[in-house]
Amino acid sequence: MLINKVKDLETGKIIPGAQLLFGYNILNVALQKDVEEVPAKHLDKLTIEDREQTSTEQRHADECNQDAERTHRDIDKSQDLRTRTLKVIKHSVDEEEVGYTIIDQFQPIFGPAIRHLQNQKVISIGAVGQNICRHGKLSWLQFATRSRVYLFDVLVLGSKVFKNGLQMVLEDKGILKVIHDCRWLGDILSHQYGIILNNVFDTQVGDVYLFSMETGGFLPHGTRTLEECLIHHLSMLPSKVSFLAHRQTLTKEYHDIWFDRPMDPTLLKLLSLEVTYLMPLRSAMLDAMFSDFTLLVDGYLNAYRRGTADILESPELSVAELPKELQQLRVLQQMRREKALKEYDVNNKGLLTRVEAEKAPRSEASGTKHDAELENVVKLTKSEKSFHQTMTTNAPLLENQTEKQQGALCQKFPVVPNCFPRGPFDYYLYKKWASNDTPTTNVS
């Protein structure tokens, strides 16, 4: 059912545009009529039944007026809290510079925006509304490229926003879409608009995958929010991304916040920043995902050229055997598992519990600049120096041990609390095992 001229009786606001309602959305239908007060001079002409009915209607009207007054007081308190929350958000996003384009009509900028999106290889997407799923309602769709941000007003434009071009972008397999938790958006697009999202990079999935890499195959007890991912993977300060937590509060407390028109500029900037940060987050995750692969290739490259001619074998004879340089990945994973079991608690489902303290941003030395560090000097802390000395002593033993023996030997290694598994220390260990050469080390 499509209805026009919709008014929210709780807030008194007029909701713009045509509203689509499904059968399960309609709980009750009632005709509204005013209760007219009967003049006192006519009361003597009424029967007892009429008097009782009139009295009942009058009491009902008084109760309605009292309820209305209480509702207005509650609304005023809610508006005050909402205003204060918006001020906090404004303070947190004021320092950030981001430009955005609002698309709330089909002419003249809708067409150029669609063409720009179609020419991209990677875009990031966000969405807000009420209960984003097949039973919910979309209000805004956010799209970001490396140079532009578009905010599509789905509430005003309606389903035509998809038919006129966005559906082609969302279903295009040649365009990678970066989304944080794509489940809800995929559900509402599929069931309400018949759109199937294709070629998605989900940063929430990426975070779980990287945690599994860092812990040697373990899984975390839960997923991270976008705010937590930005802090952990991009080392962003919590104050820089606090607006994302306030966004969740607004959405939870004020279900209609994203249906206000015109939209508060602070909220528009919030939506723009949220989708803008997804692009660098994906890049950081990809670098971390390929770190093990990069280390293996580097060790492979140096396997023969740094050794003597005596170790060279016939290529035909060695093809079927797994080289020792690749077998070191198993050792590295075993070490990570041992380290993870000492750093994390394991719940009754066998999942590792990530603690709240993990939200603190990591230092640059713990892996955020690992690409440059792999090429330059490996710097070790005092705690890592002890670990380095242990590995220097035991590295020759690891090469010829079985998996069980390697695991037992790994238990002897001291745990380094601040050693980030994706950083330069993994690189040092791998280089130590994969060759007889000791890399240049600057111990600080």
From Swiss-Prot:
One of its GO terms (molecular function) is RNA binding. One of its GO terms (biological process) is regulatory ncRNA-mediated gene silencing. SUPFAM superfamilies: Ribonuclease H-like. It is found in: Cytoplasm. Residues 49-76 are annotated as: Disordered. RNA-binding component of the PET complex, a multiprotein complex required for the processing of piRNAs during spermatogenesis. The piRNA metabolic process mediates the repression of transposable elements during meiosis by forming complexes composed of piRNAs and Piwi proteins and governs the methylation and subsequent repression of transposable elements, preventing their mobilization, which is essential for the germline integrity. The PET complex is required during the secondary piRNAs metabolic process for the piwil2 slicing-triggered loading of piwil4 piRNAs. Belongs to the EXD1 family. This is piRNA biogenesis protein EXD1.
